[in-house]
């Protein structure tokens, strides 16, 4: 079994395509069920963020599984396979593992070094586990990716600037607002999830004077507002029907709800701008960080309003981590990848070694029974001594080659040694004793492949 990755991200697709492929928390369980119902897929995990969707599947056949994943994503997005192919990337085996480690480290993010991806991978893993879609391979892969990401962030300065999509968007907003930036201004945050919490934290550090949190569940909005108040910021949490009134006072608004369809309509913004207490000299900057987008695209055409969405941020990416920090992170990823793959190769050969020792033990027992029939006069002490001697001989004969084959198996191409043992000693590759769910993460090349390969 090998790992197959099919993904679409900010590096390969424009925002309109990402919107169609986007996987919400509601979508994810349904898609995982479809993946597990496929004939070539035994485990699955879906990583979905504001600028990427990646399906990780444990498969028994590359081409068959690639077709199945492609069809499921095409059906979900409404894109035909040709259109999906134009924006998708495929990684297989070692390359899929390497990619996830790089993603967890923040090396593939739009803002290099951002830490939010770790929480998003953790959420994807938890969702997979909750649906019993995570077997041994996904468990080990996800856990190791999280460990690698944490190590990169703790041992390098890749996130020393504390940059994230939220911070980059708010920095741009401050520049548009002009003198003083966000200091003393009023902000609206739409959505009380993790991105909403991150927005409140950044706004607080930027010196914002007032925050209004808008959420469909007012209790959650109030809880997030209390966090802001505890840090000395005037804040309220309101229900969604208060959105226009809240916008009327705002200099900046941040949205990232994960909802399907426009959460903030053109009519909502018109009402806000028409509120009698709206200061018409204010410029409203809206940071739409949702995928799909939360803001009706027509809002961008209104005078006195600037919309910064993921497409805008992609066109003018922020400076990422220092080159030296990114290089240090890549070095860690490369070392961790080598260690992980060596462990997986060793895990593959171990069941074969166990089967070989069991085969030898069975032969010894059969010969001892044959000895009993040929020399019935042996007393128990004599028979025990013969048995110990035969077993010692067998153990000594097997010790060096089995230790050596484990050493050799941990190197690239090591799976061939397990195959050689099975062939030489007639150990059936389908036997549970010979092969106990091997990971086989090094079966295949490291290059990306087309979706229609």
From Swiss-Prot:
Binding site for substrate: 49-52, 109, 114-116, 120
Catalytic activity: (S)-4-amino-5-oxopentanoate + tRNA(Glu) + NADP(+) = L-glutamyl-tRNA(Glu) + NADPH + H(+)
Stored SUPFAM superfamilies: Glutamyl tRNA-reductase catalytic, N-terminal domain, Glutamyl tRNA-reductase dimerization domain, NAD(P)-binding Rossmann-fold domains
Record-level GO BP terms: protoporphyrinogen IX biosynthetic process from glutamate
InterPro entries, per database record: 4pyrrol_synth_GluRdtase, 4pyrrol_synth_GluRdtase_dimer, 4pyrrol_synth_GluRdtase_N, GluRdtase_CS, GluRdtase_dimer_dom_sf, GluRdtase_N_sf, NAD(P)-bd_dom_sf, Shikm_DH/Glu-tRNA_Rdtase
Binding annotation for NADP(+): 191-196
A GO term for molecular function: glutamyl-tRNA reductase activity
Pathway membership: Porphyrin-containing compound metabolism; protoporphyrin-IX biosynthesis; 5-aminolevulinate from L-glutamyl-tRNA(Glu): step 1/2
Entry superkingdom: Bacteria
Catalytic residues (UniProt): 50
Biased composition (Basic and acidic residues): 443-453
Region: Disordered, residue numbers: 432-453
Positions marked as site (Important for activity): 99
Keyword terms, alphabetized: NADP, Oxidoreductase, Porphyrin biosynthesis
EC number(s) on file: 1.2.1.70
Subunit structure as annotated in this protein's UniProt entry: Homodimer.
Additional detail: During catalysis, the active site Cys acts as a nucleophile attacking the alpha-carbonyl group of tRNA-bound glutamate with the formation of a thioester intermediate between enzyme and glutamate, and the concomitant release of tRNA(Glu). The thioester intermediate is finally reduced by direct hydride transfer from NADPH, to form the product GSA.
UniProt record similarity statement: Belongs to the glutamyl-tRNA reductase family.
Record remark: domains: Possesses an unusual extended V-shaped dimeric structure with each monomer consisting of three distinct domains arranged along a curved 'spinal' alpha-helix. The N-terminal catalytic domain specifically recognizes the glutamate moiety of the substrate. The second domain is the NADPH-binding domain, and the third C-terminal domain is responsible for dimerization.
UniProt name for this protein: Glutamyl-tRNA reductase
Organism: Rhodococcus erythropolis (strain PR4 / NBRC 100887)
